[in-house]
Amino acid sequence: MSVRHVTTDHAEIRRWVEERGGHPAIVTGVEGEEGILRLDLPGYSGQEFLQPVGWDEFFRRFEAKALAFAYEDDGRYFAFVDRTPRRV
């Protein structure tokens, strides 16, 4: 059974991605937009729309958007989630 984790630790995120043969990327957006963060993992579709970026640039954008990384330890599921606490 997969266990879901949520982290903001850069080393943990990078390790998870690299263990799956992936690398950081962005989806090039509309002119003037910064691009949407993505991870390019082998076998996923849409790779023709991805632009590789370095880890420093990836994490700069990750922090600027106040994201966290949700993932399963034994699979390839991941999502970028808002790390800002929600008010009820």
Show where each model-derived region lies:
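A charge-rich, low-complexity, intrinsically flexible signal that marks solvent-exposed coils, linkers
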Residues: 1-88
